[in-house]
UniProtKB/Swiss-Prot annotation:
PANTHER family: SHIKIMATE O-HYDROXYCINNAMOYLTRANSFERASE, TRICHOTHECENE 3-O-ACETYLTRANSFERASE. GO terms for cellular component: cytoplasm; membrane. One of its GO terms (biological process) is lignin biosynthetic process. Its EC number is 2.3.1.133. GO terms for molecular function: quinate O-hydroxycinnamoyltransferase activity; shikimate O-hydroxycinnamoyltransferase activity. 4-coumaroyl-CoA binds at residues 252-255, 284-290, 370-373. This is Shikimate O-hydroxycinnamoyltransferase. Gene3D superfamilies: Chloramphenicol acetyltransferase-like domain. It comes from Arabidopsis thaliana (Mouse-ear cress). It comes from the Eukaryota. The gene is HST. It catalyses: shikimate + 4-coumaroyl-CoA = trans-4-coumaroylshikimate + CoA. Belongs to the plant acyltransferase family. The active site is at H153, D380.
């Protein structure tokens, strides 16, 4: 796909903002170190000012005033801990066009083509050199447009990131800020002294393959990214399987879907019966902490539920067995457990050793992040809601996302990166409901 860059600007806050250093909590520091990629697609409206860059940039500049850390840079404090230097240096805003059309993207699988709609970040000059937010509006030959977003994960998780993007889109429509961001991460400070009360398996090393994989088939060049849509009827049928074999515990649709994906991936990978597999479920702590965090808390509140099973149990038992493992872990994630996790992290000599990455999710393990409850379709800049929003790439084999339907038809989509030889089998098993 050919992309022609028309303009590239650093957009700064519209008025003076606090010059300060923002302390990062332990959960800000153990999430993957990359710019989370996402892409929005918009159909043409016929408006003469459709996605006018000037309108977009002025609103962006206004939104950066309350959300001033987004215009900062990363730096290390005297102890080497990463924090945010709120210096108002700005965010990158790129305008581009392409002879391609939106329909060229088909089902919007987060492939390398989609990644071209987001500005590349050069990390080579050190952590203080790059913006925390990079944005690109791309105009298509069909008249439509996309908004590509790369957001440094230390700055925000999905919930906070969307709070910013949706505030920006509101301001582009002339609306005022509704929920101010709460910019103080010390609410997630560990206790002094730390008092971890649980064995935090989520921060223990992931199981590795007992029989090593063929390196010629397991490298990044042999990883495929696909997206699969499950209809409302298929999801209802899947949830009904929680009652198989006389099981009396009711599991949620999400627990059943996550369990089904975990099993299907295990089958597709052909895991031996005695192979351990760990599932990493991103879990938002906002509603689980007591007292609850302020609604505009700006940062990362992502904890991880990590059920562990042997493949033989996972594959030979009904889907509700996998869902049950997931359910039991999610139920545990209350205030006591999350505070214990913060304390456990505080006691680690080097948090960088716990940063998630390719080594975490690769075969035999799996990561699932749900965007189902996130307001991913609310970014209306004045020209309508997006027809699609999803990840702009999946950086690691074994990482997956569950996405809601843009049309509220009750369907869900699973975007996933797997070894190419496993993907076809995964598709087959996923639709065997």
């Amino acid at each position: 796909m050919k992309i022609n860059i028309r303009d590239s600007t650093m957009v700064r806050p519209a008025t003076e903002t606090p010059i300060t250093n923002l302390w990062n909590s332990n959960v800000d520091l153990v999430i993957p170190r990359f710019h989370t990629p996402s892409v929005y697609f918009y159909r043409p409206t016929g408006a003469s000012n459709f996605f006018d860059p000037q309108v977009m940039k002025e609103a962006l500049s206004k939104a950066l005033v309350p959300f001033y850390p987004m215009a900062g840079r990363l730096k290390r404090d005297d102890d080497g801990r990463i924090e945010i230097d709120c210096n108002g240096a700005g965010v990158l805003f790129v305008v581009a066009d392409t002879p391609s059309v939106i329909d060229d993207f088909g089902d919007f699988a987060p492939t390398l083509n989609l990644r071209q709609l987001i500005p590349e970040v050069d990390h080579s000059a050190g952590i203080h050199s790059f913006p925390l937010l990079v944005l690109q509006v791309t105009f298509f030959k069909c008249g439509g447009a996309s908004l590509g977003v790369g957001m440094q994960h230390h700055a925000a998780d999905g919930f906070s990131g969307l709070h910013f993007i949706n505030t920006w889109s509101d301001m582009a429509r002339g609306l005022d800020l509704t929920i101010p961001p709460f910019i103080d991460r010390t609410l997630l400070r560990a206790r002094d002294p730390p008092q971890p009360a649980f064995h935090h398996v989520e921060y223990q090393p992931a199981p590795s393959m007992k029989i090593p994989l063929d390196p010629s088939k397991s490298g990044p060049e042999n990883t495929t990214v696909s997206i699969f849509k499950l209809t409302r009827d298929q999801l209802v049928a899947l949830k009904a399987k929680s009652k198989e074999d006389g099981n009396t515990v009711s599991y949620s649709s999400y627990e059943m879907l996550a369990g089904h994906v975990w099993r299907s991936v295990g089958k597709a990978r052909g895991l031996p019966n005695d192979q351990e597999t760990k599932l990493y479920i991103a879990t938002d702590g906002r509603s689980r902490l007591r007292p609850q965090l302020p609604p505009g808390y700006f940062g990362n509140v992502i904890f991880t539920a990590t059920p562990l099973a042997v493949a033989g149990d996972l594959l030979s038992k009904p889907t509700w067995y996998a869902a049950g493992q997931i359910h039991d872990f999610l139920v545990r994630m209350d205030d006591n457990y999350l505070r214990s996790a913060l304390d456990y992290l505080e006691m680690q000599p080097d948090l960088s050793a716990l940063v998630r990455g390719a080594h975490t999710y690769k075969c035999p393990n799996l990561g699932i992040t749900s965007w189902v409850r996130l307001p991913i379709y609310d970014a209306d800049f004045g020209w309508g809601r997006p027809i699609f929003m999803g990840p702009g790439g999946i950086p690691y084999e074994g990482l997956s996302f569950v996405l809601p339907s843009p049309t509220n038809d009750g369907s869900l989509s699973v975007a996933i990166a797997l070894q190419s030889e496993h993907m076809k089998l995964f598709e087959k098993f996923l639709f065997e409901i």
